[in-house]
Amino acid sequence: MAKVKVAILGSGNIGTDLMIKLERSSHLELTAMIGIDPESDGLKKAKTKGYYVFDGGLKQFLSEASELADLVFDATSAKAHVRHAKALREAGKMVIDLTPAAVGPYVVPSVNLGDYLEESNLNLITCGGQATIPIVHAINRVAQVHYSEIVATIASKSAGPGTRANIDEFTQTTAHGLEAIGGAKKGKAIIILNPAEPPIIMRNAVYALVECEQMDEVAIARSVQETVAYIQSYVPGYRLRTEPLFEGNKVTVFVEVEGAGDYLPTYSGNLDIMTATAIKVAEEWVQHRVKAASV
């Protein structure tokens, strides 16, 4: 099967890590990196590796070499993606959105990936969303979650300008994802940037208040374990810190994410889960497209 050509929009930490990961993909061929800072490490590395490099932003890419990619990963910011989405849609490009812009439908691979493969813009919510929404969904499969609250703690060093610019969108988009995808009737999200040295890996606390009459500790624990195993198939550093904890109708789950160390330090699990998920979604989209074409 021929690989699908892709481009990365955004030459920061996430875009550069994505570039390294794409080298291992059997379905995706990176052709170009697009940025606005010619001195960025991402654009410099991309040029060294022989990829096409555009430092005039998306406008330059679309006007000069749009044919280089059928799919574009947007690793910029939520505000920028709103503009990018329109231009990429008009250019007929498939888009995987790694910002909290939520222009397209929310996608969490373990929950609803197959539902939106005909869409042209898929949103990956946030790092906290990818780490915690599957857990809420796993609990909700067994017992209705009336309220869910998640606290995502990440190393301050792993939060670059893009992450810091997206804090408000992070909390809003993640909270909505807990409800729309996780199934909670009400969701709340909190993000903490921890300045500790040495930097900590990403840690997430998931709290869920469930329907008392539906509480089944064994079934909930099994459902959570199944979800964790699925996520580990594409994010190996994702794991439970402890077994799920139960108190009355409250379920508490602690998960952590250690990065693969491709471009980013291993403590940057919050960024790693986004890049790994982006590739998972893109590869599933490619396989879906191939199957559809063969029918």
Swiss-Prot record:
NAD(+) binds at residues 11-14, 158-166, 270. This is Acetaldehyde dehydrogenase. The keyword Oxidoreductase applies. GO terms for biological process: catabolic process. GO terms for molecular function: acetaldehyde dehydrogenase (acetylating) activity; NAD binding. SUPFAM superfamilies: Glyceraldehyde-3-phosphate dehydrogenase-like, C-terminal domain, NAD(P)-binding Rossmann-fold domains. Belongs to the acetaldehyde dehydrogenase family. HAMAP family: Ac_ald_DH_ac. Its EC number is 1.2.1.10. It is an enzyme of class 1 (oxidoreductase). InterPro entries: Acetaldehyde_dehydrogenase, Acetylaldehyde_DH_C, NAD(P)-bd_dom_sf, Semialdehyde_DH_NAD-bd. Keywords: Aromatic hydrocarbons catabolism, NAD, Oxidoreductase. It catalyses: acetaldehyde + NAD(+) + CoA = acetyl-CoA + NADH + H(+). Disulfide bonds: none annotated. The active site is at residue 127. The keyword Oxidoreductase applies.
